[in-house]
Regions:
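Short acidic, glycine/serine/threonine-rich loops at helix termini
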Residues: 32-36, 98-102, 130-135, 159-163, ...
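Extended hydrophobic packing segments that form well-structured cores
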Residues: 181-235
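Solvent-exposed alpha-helices and their adjacent loops that cap or buttress functional pockets
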Residues: 12-16, 79-82, 111-114, 140, ...
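Non-catalytic terminal/interface segments that mediate subunit docking, oligomerization
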Residues: 20-119, 123-126, 235
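A glycine-rich phosphate-binding loop feature that marks nucleotide/adenosyl-phosphate handling sites
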Residues: 3, 13-14, 21-27, 122-125, ...
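Single conserved hydrophobic/aromatic residue that forms the stacking wall/gate
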Residues: 1-9
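Extended C-terminal subregions enriched in glycine
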Residues: 94-95, 112-163, 168
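Conserved phosphate/anionic-ligand binding catalytic regions in large, soluble enzymes, centered on
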Residues: 87-99, 154-163, 174-178, 189-206
């Protein structure tokens, strides 16, 4: 395959059909609620309108689940705040070096708590995993109560960290369709997955499961450089 690769360069004069310009400083952390990646709100909007938005999600879920199981999210509200049961950063979508380093910076010095909330991180590759060990990110995550697992995309398709029945999981992964996380509707099971960015998931973990946008925490990101070690694959 390496012999089949070649460099791609633009010509001296290049024409484009158009350009999409995005001012990233104006983008707020988002959450895609169950049960579709397009069911999107800003985290601030959700936290400000919890009862109304969760009720709307529940009504849509009745259609998605075809009434096969009972479904509720409003029971996740405690003292006016939304508490989730699980946080996961995983695989090709979330498990990149920069994401996990930023998550480690956010959660460093905090503790995820000893209640129901759990936090798992799956690096996208073994070389990434090794570099995270070398630079101390894994130690910072583990000290806070994070479970750092092998390079595996399992949570994305229900092969790892399947939530408990009626649990609510926030994930930096790719999809949140009904039962994709591993629950079996034919056995009366249902769980909810909402898609978020890794930094906001880490901020939520630092707050022991209270849904938190990364913009609501004050942190200095270390931004370490990634060094690829090919020996893992060469050996």
């Amino acid at each position: 395959r390496s012999r089949g690769l070649g460099d791609v360069y633009k010509r001296q004069v290049t024409y484009y059909d158009g350009m999409v310009y995005v001012n990233l400083s104006e983008i707020k952390p988002m959450i895609a609620m169950p049960f579709h990646p397009s069911n999107v709100y800003t985290i601030d909007e959700l936290n400000a309108n919890l009862a109304d938005i969760l009720h709307d999600v529940e009504q849509k879920a009745l259609v998605s689940l075809d009434g096969a199981v009972e479904y509720s999210l409003q029971d996740k509200i405690r003292d006016g705040k939304l508490y989730v049961d699980q946080g996961i950063i995983a695989g090709c979508a979330g498990g990149g070096f920069e994401n996990i380093c930023a998550a480690a910076d956010i959660i460093k010095g905090h503790y995820i708590g000893s209640d129901e909330f759990t936090f798992s991180v799956y690096p996208a590759s073994t070389p990434i995993y090794m570099e995270l060990v070398k630079n101390g990110a894994v130690a910072d995550l583990m000290e806070a109560g994070t479970i750092v697992k092998t390079a595996f995309c399992g949570p994305c398709f229900g092969a790892g960290d399947t939530p408990a029945n009626n649990a609510f999981s926030i994930r930096h992964s790719t999809r949140n369709f009904p039962n994709r996380e591993g629950s079996k509707v034919q056995k009366g099971q249902v769980a909810s997955v909402a898609l978020m960015d890794a930094r906001s998931i880490a901020a939520t973990a630092a707050n022991k499961g209270f849904l938190t946008a990364a913009t609501d925490v004050d942190v200095n990101f270390s931004k370490p450089k990634y060094f690829f070690d090919k020996n893992i694959y060469a050996n």
